[in-house]
Structure formats: structure tokens, C-alpha cells
């Protein structure tokens, strides 16, 4: 489909009106009547078509308006990329080039294996360091897009003789892709509105904290590249719907394939695009463009997504993919009915329509029920089901609810991660709904669904951030265009609709009255009152102040909240000097250097990836959490007393036990604060042995002091955390054994171990490692050793001076001779 070109008079008036309108001109001229800033040519010229602009010669260069606009757009995008990349380097500057958090350590370890052994070995890699004694087949249980991307960049750089360590590639991958995300957001917003809004959206998403939180340097996680793939897929989908081109649809399928390989959030795409098509059908906006775009996307995208080993046959056998299949069948039926509509009478078509829709709906409904009942279609997984029923995971699957990223989002988090964009985002949504068309239906659905999911789960704030940046950019763009534009030449933007096209073909009715004026023509020709220069200046300054405050807030949040690696902690003194707490790496290095290569370490699943990545030791559970029963067994060991836990540890061949304790430095993320989740997960698998109520006081409190539950004070986790802590007095104002994290004096200070021994405690007591003793060769007797209370009358004094004198046995029993009973007493 050829896009209409804008007249030359439009470029001239836009450039003369204001600098912001000049920036908008390229977007308006590119998209014709799709963009809100575009004007109708016949209207501007009083119904007479203006002359076509003369083609620019090769010597035009930057003398043409489009040349300056292209240069300005390129400069703004480059600066946005540079600002986004630079703001993500706080962690590298303050600490060093290091992998952050927990999951990135497994991704780095997998990427290192891929770069060292090749792609084929990576797909067939069996990791014996994880989930002892089960192990893990890595190639079929990961989304390999992140590893392949980093490995490919590393291979290209080394091919060009640029020697770079694979760790540095992993550290700086997410900041690099943030620039690509800015470009893809610019392209998508330009398709939805105009070029000025696209440039604002690119600047917003480059520095917004909601996206920076998962893309700082060192955060080598799937989301670092997945948001770029998400935005680029949406851009290509909008392009496909607007043009109906198979080429753009195939590009969309390839981008979707990359998204599937990178992140499990691809399910959001495969449900949002069918929802878009379904709503277009309900709004009677069906067209051949929509049919070509979705039919091609579903078939090719389905086949490509099934090539990922971890995905496999899920697109045709899981409930979260069934909506796409249903919309595909509905679209084919709708297209077939449109075909019959042109060949049947109205009465025949209505009868066939109701009969066909009823039969098709009944057949689909019965088929889904049958396939679900027989087990061919798997039900919703726990993570997806918890999006609809927010209390489901906490009751039935506590392992999902125990993850901090799966908690509901607080109201403060929205402002903290989005700042002023929260307020301007609804305004941009209203502008899109007011000037609705096919692609703006998509962004409206995107916004509504993303807001819901972000409210349910804090992790999904990441999917809300791009659409908030886009719609806020549209709102700011309209304000700037309104207050920086020329009052005499401002007109309402036309909206592409089927009713407008009908009015153009039928400008008047034969039976209209002579003095009758059509309503919509009157509204279009209605002029607005001019705005004074003072009002324009005040509003513009206020908008610029808001944007400056937004930039300052983003920089502050990035620096203070999202640029601290969890592996290295830092604290500040009263004079501003900084203390580095490197207990984690200290403990992992001790494990690497002082334990056997095949030693097995038991810890809570949060630290499994870090132990395998930094200490290179075998773990029982890790952050993959694919086996709930195995995690529950570890939780049972932590929640039981020492004797019961020792039996579990012996059955799992555990050599060392690692716990995190923050009572000395006030670290709130330690294992005592996570302990109730261990109890809940263990109770789900072993309800007869572990009960959560046993760890609370009769008043229902979780306390670590003397008033705490006896079950809690004698469990293995409590004893390992507070061993020898009762002897430590941290401050002259507090008693010995005072826990700074829970602000309480511990209740059990006399802790002794029978089956464990302390092997290592880090400098600040943050990481504590215990060695599991081997079983005794001979069982100890149950009875106590003999104790006598009979002592000699005289204190022993050694008089042995020569060998001839007899010796003396110390503590020898003294027997008293009995007396004969006299006959008189009898």
C-alpha cells in the first residue's frame, strides 16, 4: 500500500510555526493522515489539490527541511542511547565489572560454557553441579537467546582481534541493548502517532527506572534483551497491520522467534496480538490487511517458536496458547462469511451466519473441554494462574509466592519507577482513544492489560514501562504542539475511519435541505481561540520543569536503588566514607579453596546459582525451582531439630551447610527472615512432620527471643544462625546476643551441636558455613557414665618417695567393714 505524501505547503507552515512543530513535520509527512499532526491537503487549499513538491536533487542535502529533521532525529536518538548507556554504569564505576544478583550468575556460567565448548555441546550439556543427586539438562530447560546473543558478540569481537573476556560482554550487554530498546520504542511510537512523540518516548525509556532496574551493567538477565525484542515485535506487527504486507509480517515472525528464545514473557505477545485482532473484529474493523497479517503471523510464528527446545509443543498443548488458536479459527470463519456475503442474499446470509456461528462455537467449546479433560491440553501453569487468582499461589504453591518479584505492586512503586509518567500516561491513552484507528486500538489494549498485570506482580512493571513511556510521550507531544504551534494554522487532526471514506465518496444527499449543514463539517471547521504568549511561555516552562525533575529523579533512583550488586554490599559512615562488605565472595572463595572438588553444599535455593558460579561446588537446589519436592526436603531439614535434619542430610550426602545471617550488621535479607517460607514449602510436602503454627507463639507472633516458640528455638536454622552469637556484645547499650535485624535478644544462647561443626564464618558474620560430621564408628551408649559420691575422709597427699612404697589409686572406693550384731541387741 502506497502511503500518501504530504504537500509542500505543510512542511513550510510547520517549520514557520515553531521549532517543535518543525520536529513533528517529518512524522506527519511520512504517515500522511495516520498521524495527528497531518492535515488534509484539499482542506488546506480550499478544496483544490496543491501542486506536488519538486523532487530534491542530489545537491539538496541539509538545505531541505527533511535533511535537518533527519539529522536532528539521529542526534536525539544517539544522545538517548548514550544517556541510557552511561546511567547504567554506576555499579561498574563504584565497584567493578561483576555479575549481579542470582539468576545472572547461571546465565553467565551457561554463556561461558557456550563460548568455551560450542553451541552443540551447550545444547547437550548435563550440569552435574546442580540439583544433586538429580542433575539438570541445561540445553532443554533454558531460553538460549541471551546466551547465544552474548556468545555471538564475543565471537565477532575475537574474530576482529578485539580481545574481550566473556564476562565483560555479559556485563555490558544489557546497557548496550537499552539503546536498541530506545530505537524500537521510537519506531513504534512514530507508527502510532508522529516523529516528535517517538523521540520523546525514546528519551523516556532510555532513563526510566522501571526499565533500568533490569538492565544495569552486570544484570545479565533475560529481560535485558527481551524488552527490545518485545517492542520491536510490536512495531513490526503494527507495520504489518497498516500495510498488509507479507514481508513485514515475516519480519514480525522472526522478531517473535527471537523473543521466544530470549524470555518466557513471549506469552504476553501471543495473547495480546490475538486480542487485538479479536477486538478489531468486534469493532467491525476487519480488512484484508488484518487477515493477511494475523494468518501469516500465527502460522509462521507458531512453527518458529516450536524450534526452541524448552518451548517444544507448548504452543499447541498449553492453555495460555489456546486464545491465539481460537482467534485464528474465528478469523478464518469471519473471512469465509465475508466471502459468502457477496454471493448470497441478505436473508440466506443471516440464516447461515447464525447457524454457522452457533455450530462453530459449540464445536470449539466441546473440543477444548474434551482435550483438557483427556490431558492433551495442559491447564494453566502456577505462575500464569496466579495472575488471574492473586491468592492462589500463596495457598497452593508457596514456592511461587516466596519470590519477592511475584508480590503485588505497591502504589509507591509506580511513582518510584515511573515518576511523572504515571500522571501523563492516562492523557496519552485518551488522545489515542479519541483519534482511534487500527494501530491505536492495539496500544490501548497493550496499556490496559499491562496496567493490570503490573498491579498483580511487581516483576511485570517491566512490561508496563514501555507503553507508559509511549503514551506519556504522546501526551507531552500534544501539549508542546498545542502551545508551541501557530494559532492561525492549528487544525484538528482527521481520523482514518470507514465513515470518513464514505462521506468523501458521497459528499451530499440528493434530498438534503438547501440550508442544511452537515454536523461533522461544522466541527472540523470550528476555529479555536488564540493563546496569548504569556500562557504559552508559562505552560512550556512548567512542562520543561517536569521533564527536568523526571530526569533528576531517574538519575537518583538509578544511582541509589538499582546500581548495587547483591554480591557486594556497601554502607556509609557519618563522615561519608564507604565500607565495602564483601562477605559473599569471601565465603564462596573459601568454599572453592578449602573444600573437596566434589563437595555438596546445602543451602536455601536463593544461593544455588551463586554457589555453583563462584564457588564451583555442587548444590542441592537452586533458583530454577523446577522440583518443588526437592526444595521442600531442604526446607524440612532447615525446619527440623538437629537429629532429624542430620538424617535428611545423610540421605542427601551433604558435606557442608551454608546459611546467611544478618543479625550482626542488620542485613534484612537473611535466612531467618525467609524462614517461614521454608516452613510453608516443607509443610506442603510433609504436613505430618512440619506445621507452620508450631513456629509461632500462642499469641501468633514469630519471635526469636525467650518468648519464641520452643520448636523455633531448637530448629537447625535457628541454631546455625545464632551459634556463638550469644557470646557477642555488639554495643555497650545492648546485651550480648542482641539481633540488630529483628531488634531482639535471642532466646537460646547456649547452642551446642552434635552432628555439625563450624567450618567458616565471614568477617561480618554474614555467611556461615558448617561441616556435617561423619557418623560415629560405634554408637554411643545412652546411659550416663558412673558417678560416685563416696570420697575418702582424708585428702589425698602423695607420700610416694621410693619405688618400694605402694601406689595409691585416686578416687578409689572405700569400703567400710560391717559390725557383728550382738546377741544382746537381738
Curated annotation (Swiss-Prot):
Any one annotated GO CC term: oligosaccharyltransferase complex B
Glycosylation sites: 616, 623, 627, 641
Subcellular location: Endoplasmic reticulum; Endoplasmic reticulum membrane
Any one Gene Ontology molecular-function term assigned to this protein's record: metal ion binding
Keywords linked to the UniProt accession: Acetylation, Endoplasmic reticulum, Glycoprotein, Glycosyltransferase, Magnesium, Manganese, Membrane, Metal-binding, Phosphoprotein, Transferase, Transmembrane, Transmembrane helix
Motif DK motif per UniProt: ranges: 671-678
Keyword Cell wall biogenesis/degradation: no
Enzyme Commission no: 2.4.99.18
Enzyme class: transferase
Intervals of motif DXD motif 2: 221-223
Motif SVSE motif: chain residues: 402-405
Superkingdom field: Eukaryota
Residues reported in the UniProt entry to bind Mn(2+): 103, 221, 223
Site (Important for catalytic activity): 214
Task of the protein: Catalytic subunit of the oligosaccharyl transferase (OST) complex that catalyzes the initial transfer of a defined glycan (Glc(3)Man(9)GlcNAc(2) in eukaryotes) from the lipid carrier dolichol-pyrophosphate to an asparagine residue within an Asn-X-Ser/Thr consensus motif in nascent polypeptide chains, the first step in protein N-glycosylation. N-glycosylation occurs cotranslationally and the complex associates with the Sec61 complex at the channel-forming translocon complex that mediates protein translocation across the endoplasmic reticulum (ER).
Protein family according to the UniProt entry: Belongs to the STT3 family.
PANTHER family named in the record: DOLICHYL-DIPHOSPHOOLIGOSACCHARIDE--PROTEIN GLYCOSYLTRANSFERASE SUBUNIT, DOLICHYL-DIPHOSPHOOLIGOSACCHARIDE--PROTEIN GLYCOSYLTRANSFERASE SUBUNIT STT3B
Protein name as it appears in the record: Dolichyl-diphosphooligosaccharide--protein glycosyltransferase subunit STT3B
Annotated organism of origin: Canis lupus familiaris
Amino acid at each position: 500500500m502506497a502511503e500518501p505524501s504530504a504537500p509542500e505547503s505543510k512542511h513550510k507552515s510547520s517549520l514557520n510555526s515553531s521549532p517543535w512543530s518543525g520536529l513533528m513535520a517529518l512524522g506527519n509527512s511520512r504517515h500522511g493522515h495516520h498521524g495527528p499532526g497531518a492535515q488534509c491537503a484539499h482542506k488546506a487549499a480550499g478544496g483544490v489539490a496543491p501542486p506536488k513538491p519538486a523532487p530534491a536533487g542530489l545537491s539538496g542535502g541539509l538545505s531541505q527541511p527533511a535533511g535537518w529533521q533527519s539529522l536532528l532525529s539521529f542526534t536525539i536518538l544517539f544522545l538517548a542511547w548514550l544517556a541510557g548507556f552511561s546511567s547504567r554504569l554506576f555499579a561498574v564505576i563504584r565497584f567493578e565489572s561483576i555479575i549481579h544478583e542470582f539468576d545472572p550468575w547461571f546465565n553467565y556460567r551457561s554463556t561461558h560454557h557456550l563460548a568455551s565448548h560450542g553451541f552443540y555441546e551447550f545444547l547437550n550439556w548435563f550440569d552435574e553441579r546442580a540439583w544433586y543427586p538429580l542433575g539438570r539438562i541445561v540445553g532443554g530447560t533454558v531460553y538460549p537467546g541471551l546466551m547465544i546473543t552474548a556468545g555471538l558478540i564475543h565471537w565477532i569481537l575475537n574474530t576482529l582481534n578485539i580481545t574481550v573476556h566473556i564476562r565483560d560482554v555479559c556485563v555490558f550487554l544489557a546497557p548496550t541493548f537499552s539503546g536498541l530498546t530506545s530505537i524500537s520504542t521510537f519506531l513504534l511510537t512514530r507508527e502510532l502517532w508522529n516523529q516528535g512523540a517517538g523521540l520523546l518516548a525514546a528519551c523516556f525509556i532510555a532513563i526510566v527506572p522501571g526499565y533500568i532496574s533490569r538492565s544495569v551493567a552486570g544484570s545479565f538477565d533475560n529481560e535485558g534483551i527481551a524488552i527490545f525484542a518485545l517492542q520491536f515485535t510490536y512495531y513490526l506487527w503494527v507495520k504489518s497491520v497498516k500495510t498488509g504486507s507479507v514481508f513485514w509480517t515475516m519480519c514480525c515472525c522472526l522478531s517473535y522467534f527471537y523473543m521466544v528464545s530470549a524470555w518466557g514473557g513471549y506469552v504476553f505477545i501471543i495473547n495480546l496480538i490475538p486480542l487485538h485482532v479479536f477486538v478489531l473484529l468486534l469493532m467491525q474493523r476487519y480488512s484484508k490487511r488484518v487477515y493477511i497479517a494475523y494468518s501469516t503471523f500465527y502460522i509462521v510464528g507458531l512453527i518458529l517458536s516450536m524450534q526452541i527446545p524448552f518451548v517444544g509443543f507448548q504452543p499447541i498443548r498449553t492453555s495460555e496458547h489456546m486464545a491465539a488458536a481460537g482467534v485464528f479459527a474465528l478469523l478464518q470463519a469471519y473471512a469465509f462469511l465475508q466471502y459468502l456475503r457477496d454471493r448470497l442474499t441478505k436473508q440466506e446470509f443471516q440464516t447461515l451466519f447464525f447457524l454457522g456461528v452457533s455450530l462453530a462455537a459449540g464445536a470449539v467449546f466441546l473440543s477444548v473441554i474434551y482435550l483438557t479433560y483427556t490431558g492433551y491440553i495442559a491447564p494453566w501453569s502456577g505462575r500464569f494462574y496466579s495472575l488471574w487468582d492473586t491468592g492462589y499461589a500463596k495457598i497452593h504453591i508457596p514456592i511461587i509466592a516466596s519470590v519477592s518479584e511475584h508480590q503485588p505492586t505497591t502504589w509507591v512503586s509506580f511513582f518510584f519507577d515511573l515518576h511523572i509518567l504515571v500522571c501523563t500516561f492516562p492523557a496519552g491513552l485518551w488522545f489515542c482513544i479519541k483519534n482511534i484507528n487500527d494501530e491505536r486500538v492495539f496500544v490501548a489494549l497493550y496499556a490496559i492489560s499491562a496496567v493490570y498485570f503490573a498491579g498483580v506482580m511487581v516483576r511485570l512493571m517491566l512490561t508496563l514501562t514501555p507503553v507508559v513511556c509511549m503514551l506519556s510521550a504522546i501526551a507531552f507531544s500534544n501539549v508542546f504542539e498545542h502551545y508551541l504551534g501557530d494559532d492561525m494554522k492549528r487544525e484538528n487532526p482527521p481520523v482514518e475511519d470507514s465513515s470518513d471514506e464514505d462521506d468523501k465518496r458521497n459528499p451530499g444527499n440528493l434530498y438534503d435541505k438547501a440550508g442544511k449543514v452537515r454536523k461533522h463539517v461544522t466541527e472540523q471547521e470550528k476555529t479555536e481561540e488564540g493563546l496569548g504568549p504569556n500562557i504559552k511561555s508559562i505552560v512550556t516552562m512548567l512542562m520543561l520543569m517536569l521533564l527536568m525533575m523526571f530526569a533528576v529523579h531517574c538519575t537518583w533512583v538509578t544511582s541509589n536503588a538499582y546500581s548495587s550488586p547483591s554480591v557486594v554490599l556497601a554502607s556509609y559512615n557519618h563522615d561519608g566514607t564507604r565500607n565495602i562488605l564483601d562477605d559473599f565472595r569471601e565465603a564462596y572463595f573459601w568454599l572453592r579453596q578449602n573444600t573437596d572438588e566434589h563437595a555438596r553444599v546445602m543451602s536455601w535455593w536463593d544461593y544455588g546459582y551463586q554457589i555453583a558460579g563462584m564457588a564451583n561446588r555442587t548444590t542441592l537446589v537452586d533458583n530454577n525451582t523446577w522440583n518443588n519436592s526437592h526444595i521442600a526436603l531442604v526446607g524440612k531439614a532447615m525446619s527440623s531439630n538437629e537429629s532429624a535434619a542430620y538424617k535428611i542430610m545423610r540421605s542427601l550426602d551433604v558435606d557442608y551447610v551454608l546459611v546467611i545471617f544478618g543479625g550482626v550488621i542488620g542485613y534484612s535479607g537473611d535466612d531467618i527472615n525467609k524462614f517461614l517460607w521454608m516452613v510453608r514449602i516443607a509443610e506442603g510436602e510433609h504436613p505430618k512432620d512440619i506445621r507452620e503454627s508450631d513456629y509461632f507463639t500462642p499469641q501468633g507472633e514469630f519471635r526469636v527471643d525467650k518468648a519464641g516458640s520452643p520448636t523455633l528455638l531448637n530448629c537447625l536454622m535457628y541454631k546455625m544462625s545464632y551459634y556463638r552469637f550469644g557470646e557477642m556484645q555488639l554495643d555497650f547499650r545492648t546485651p550480648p546476643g542482641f539481633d540488630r535485624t529483628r531488634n531482639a535478644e535471642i532466646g537460646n544462647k547456649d547452642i551446642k551441636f552434635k552432628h555439625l561443626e563450624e567450618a567458616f564464618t565471614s568477617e561480618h558474620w554474614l555467611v556461615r558455613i558448617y561441616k556435617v560430621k561423619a557418623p560415629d564408628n560405634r554408637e554411643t551408649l545412652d546411659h550416663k557414665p558412673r558417678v560416685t559420691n563416696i570420697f575418702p575422709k582424708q585428702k589425698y597427699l602423695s607420700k610416694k618417695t621410693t619405688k618400694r612404697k605402694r601406689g595409691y589409686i585416686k578416687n578409689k572406693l572405700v569400703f567400710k567393714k560391717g559390725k557383728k550384731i550382738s546377741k544382746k541387741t537381738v
